[in-house]
Amino acid sequence: MNKRVLKFLCLGLILPVMTAGMVSCKSAGSKSGADGEIHLAIVDDIVSMDAHKTSNDYIVPMNVFDSLFSIKKNPDGTTEIVNSLADSYTVSDDGLVYKFTLKDGIVFSDGTPLKADDVKFTFERILTLPDSAQTDFVIAIDGAEELLNGQATELRGITVEDDLHFTITLAEPFSGFIAQLATPSTVIYSRKIVTEAGNDFGTVPEKTIGTGPYIVTAWNRGSSLSFEYNTRYWGEEPSVKKVEIKVMDASSMNMAFQKGDLDILDCLFLDSAIVDSTYKNGAYKDSLVSVDRLGTNYFLLNENIEPLTDVKVRKAIQLSIDRDSILQSVYGGDGKLEDGIYPSGCLGYSQANQGWLKRDTQEAKKLLKEAGYENGFDMEISVDAGAADAINNSIQIIAENLKEVGINANIKSYDHASWLDLRNSGKMPSFVALWILDFNDPDNIIYTFFGSVDNTVSRSDNYGDTATIARVADARKIVNTDERMAEYAALEKKLVQDDAVWVPLYSLKHTYVKGSRVKNFTPHWAGWSDIYFSGVELF
């Protein structure tokens, strides 16, 4: 799935690195927290309220709709999948057949009952909607490929028994399937509501109706969004009853917070020096909320472009980068070094694959000499013109590090559309980016980048070992969890340590500052900037 840095730092997302974000704000003259109202701000307006039409804008899907499952983060940092719209499910021994029961009595905010047929409708819509952004999340279902390619008119892998019971059959075993059903990419829509709304669904608030804790009451494009509590909501009543979101630049958010007009400040969009001096070491230090972001920053190399075709050259690049210097100087040390593909906290994270990568410029020079590049070479690092300052600063340090071993890294900027086109074409020489998990499973990262030849091209790594690509694809079919995680660890070692197609950098913390009206705030489990309004508890 194409991931973002665009509007919000979400899901698993790849974040090519654009400035964006969300901050809660309470403007002067707004109602007090006792009234259950908060004001929020976003840097860029959303493009659509329809989850099927975006891989960036999840603030509406997360709060207006529900998925069959959700993800809960435990105090020890682990996560678990819990039931949401689904009341229960079973899986066959061969890992192919999933039988589901929906919770009884759930209705959409207009009173329309939730039915099992709505699940089938939703997943068929994901596969048939032109330019759908979420096909990856249901492609494992039997018949999905045929429906996607126009070779079928319905999804044969879903059978509806009655209003509360349905069965999903997969084309082949995939142990990460339930985790995919716990994402905002797979929120459930009503066949009746969407059909009657037509093109107004996802664009007109009163026609964009879900089962979640909030309803959209207004969307003034480019300006604001308004939400109110859904009195028909089936779950626990939230503390926040009304939400007003304004489009506002990050600098204004910071100023507003310091004036006392903000409820929550997302430090992601501030310079680390400001965060350190004003918030971490200032009067707000007791109001910080930090979570480990389940995401990884990485430097990806294109194996189709000389001399990156040579594994010794790629290993030399791995050894040249002073990752700790970047982490300290750019991010204020607010994170940890990662030596593999999967970030800390990800299911399948292998401690055995950590600790091997240390900066060694002499060894890097030796490898370059063995590869025939004793005098170095020129290469390009491609950067999105809308990249955040932190990304630009990181790339600058990487270029300086490479220069120390004789590699002249030219940093070339592209507008966002051109950057994406170049990467998707498989012709981007190298780039630095961030991937944040959509769902907590190693498949979310490794399959996206290395699960097929097409995937390796669209990510511009052009990894050429077809046997390893086949292993990545086959790993998702392993039913035994321990065996599957062992294979993912072995694949991580092969890709990063042996073949050096991936240069691991670091994972970061995501830090927020609570305003005086906020009693508790639970960030998204993966550290997205998108927040669940119900995760905010007011005094």
Label every model-predicted segment.
Residues 220, 318-348, 390-397, 422-539:
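Detector for C-terminal structural segments
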Residues 41-93, 209-210:
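N-terminal lobe/hinge region of extracytoplasmic solute-binding protein
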Residues 230-276, 408:
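Ligand-site clamp/hinge motif
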Residues 87-135, 167, 256, 307-309:
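Aromatic- and charge-enriched surface segment that lines or borders ligand/interaction sites
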Residues 73-76, 153, 163, 170-238, ...:
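Gly/Pro-rich hinge or "lid" segments in bacterial periplasmic/extracellular proteins
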Residues 1-38, 49, 358, 537-539:
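Short, low-complexity disordered leader/linker segments with a strong preference
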Residues 336-370, 385-393:
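Structural transition elements
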Residues 115-122, 163-169, 212-213, 240-242, ...:
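Alpha-helical secondary-structure segments
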